[in-house]
C-alpha cells in the first residue's frame, strides 16, 4: 500500500469539505438536530406523561402528516435535481417554457409522487397499529393542503439556492426539512420549547397545523383559527418563495450558473 496515494485522496476530500460551507454544515447538522429534536420529545414526555390518552395514534398520525411535508418538498427538489444530474438543466430553460409553467408542472408532479409514497404507508398503519389518519375527518384535507403548500414553498427555496449556488447546495435539499422538525412542534406543544425558540416557531405554519391535529384527536374539536393562521403564513412564504425563485433564475442566467450546472 502506498501511503502517499492514500494521503493524496484524503486531502482531495478534505479540501472539498473545507472549501464548501454547505458540506461543513451538513456534517454538524445531523447530530445536532437529532439531539435537539429527541431532547424536546423526551422533555415533553417527562413533564406531561399523561398528556395523551392515545399516544401511539397521535404520534403516528403526526408522523404521517409530517411525511406529507417531507415528501412534497423532497419530490419538488428531486425533480429539479434530476434535471441537473441528467445534464438536462440547460435544455430545460432553452425549451419554449415559461418559468411559471415549469413551476406549475413541478408542483403537480410532486403531488403525484407524494401520494404514491404516502398511500401505502397510510393503508399499512391501520392493520399493523390500529391507527387511521382518516379519524381526523374532513379537516384532514385542509391540513394536507396546508402541509403540501408549505412543502412546495420549501422546495422553491431550495431550488432557488441550487440555481444561485450550484450543486454544492444539494445537501441543503436533504437537510432543510429536518432543521424545521424541532421548531415545528410535530410531536409536542409549543410550550416545550424555550421562550426564544417559541418566538421563532410561531412564525412557522407547522406549529399551527400540528397543534390543530392534536386538538382534533384529543378533544374532537376543530379550531379554525389555527388553520387560518397556518394558511396566512403559507401564503406569505409561498409568495416570497416564488419571488426568490424568479430572482435566483435571473441572477443565474446573468452569471452563467445555469449553463455550468447543465454541463
Where are these regions (language model features)?
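Hydrophobic transmembrane alpha-helices and immediately adjacent juxtamembrane helices
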Residues: 1-263
